[in-house]
Amino acid sequence: MPASLQMSSFELKEVGTGRFELVGEMSFDTADKILESSRRLFGNYAGLEVDLSQVSKADSAGLALLLEWKAQANQKAGAINFLGMPDSLVAIARTTEVSDMI
């Protein structure tokens, strides 16, 4: 059964095996809570896919979250792919020269 964790300004839900959707904010206000939720939901999947197309607000804390997810996936010898990345995150990644890391 797909899992879902909803907080006040975001929801991270499993939409298929190893496939997740994030809805709401990826910001300084939510990044630590999203990370905590993801640890419970992502489990031991070797491959992950996270749809970000429903993210309504994203800042540099959101980018840091993506980089943390990448690092965690690499530690497990797995992969994580991001779909529908918000333009604001793409711009921050380019400005900070980490776009090749995500």
Where do the protein language model's features map onto the residues?
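STAS-typified acidic loop motif
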Residues: 3-36, 102
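Amphipathic alpha-helical interaction surfaces in cytosolic regulatory modules
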Residues: 25-102
